[in-house]
């Protein structure tokens, strides 16, 4: 009699195919000069935006923020999470959050990039909803890196924060 052994689900390893990272469309424009921009310069540009200083840098940053906010608003409408559109984040709210957090991810404390060149850049800034049953509102959002935002999924934010802190402690020892 022939014996067939089937592997258990946990024994099956998934092969992750590394895709080539694509450049964002914006970087092909002549206005894109942010290939190696420092964190300090990004911080200065945010301050200039808040002070209503209009120059090429602030215009591009504001356009980038508006683009993300438009996407977040679309997500919220699709999931019917925003009842009052006045509660939705605006550019000024995002700029204040970026200053308050000093461009650091809420969870892993990594410096987030405002000007990034690759699609799905892991350390690009995102607006993370603390409670996923509500939309991208001022009282419900923090700045996080894309990596933490995607890996948290629907986990309770305090639990995820604790997990990240423990990982940082383990790395240091």
Regions found by a protein language model. Name each.
Residues 106-109, 147:
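Short, cysteine/histidine-rich loop/knuckle motifs that typically chelate Zn2+
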Residues 1-76, 93:
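Mixed-charge, low-complexity interaction segments
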Residues 130-142, 150-173:
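Polybasic, low-complexity binding patches
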Residues 56-107, 133:
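Short, charged surface segments at domain edges that flank catalytic/cofactor-binding sites
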Residues 53, 97, 163:
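Residues that form generic nucleotide/phosphate-binding pockets
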Residues 104, 141-144:
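Short pre-active-site segment immediately N-terminal to redox-active cysteine/selenocysteine motifs
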Residues 110-141:
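Histidine-centered nuclease catalytic patch
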Residues 95, 112-115, 152:
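Polyanion-binding and phosphate-handling cores
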């Amino acid at each position: 009699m022939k014996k067939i052994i089937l592997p258990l689900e946990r024994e099956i390893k998934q092969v992750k195919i590394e895709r080539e990272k694509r450049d964002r469309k914006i970087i092909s424009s002549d206005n894109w000069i942010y290939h190696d921009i420092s964190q300090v310069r990004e911080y200065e540009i945010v301050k200039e935006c808040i002070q209503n200083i209009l120059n090429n840098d602030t215009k591009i940053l504001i356009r980038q923020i508006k683009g993300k906010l438009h996407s977040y608003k679309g997500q919220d409408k699709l999931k019917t999470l925003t009842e009052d559109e006045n509660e939705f984040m605006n550019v000024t709210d995002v700029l204040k959050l970026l200053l308050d957090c000093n461009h650091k991810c809420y969870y892993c404390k990594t410096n987030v990039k405002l000007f990034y060149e690759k699609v799905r850049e892991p350390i690009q800034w995102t607006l993370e909803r603390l409670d996923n049953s509500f939309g991208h509102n001022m009282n419900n959002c923090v700045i996080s890196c894309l990596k933490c935002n995607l890996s948290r999924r629907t986990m309770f934010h305090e639990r995820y924060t604790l997990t990240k802190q423990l990982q940082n402690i383990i790395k240091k020892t």
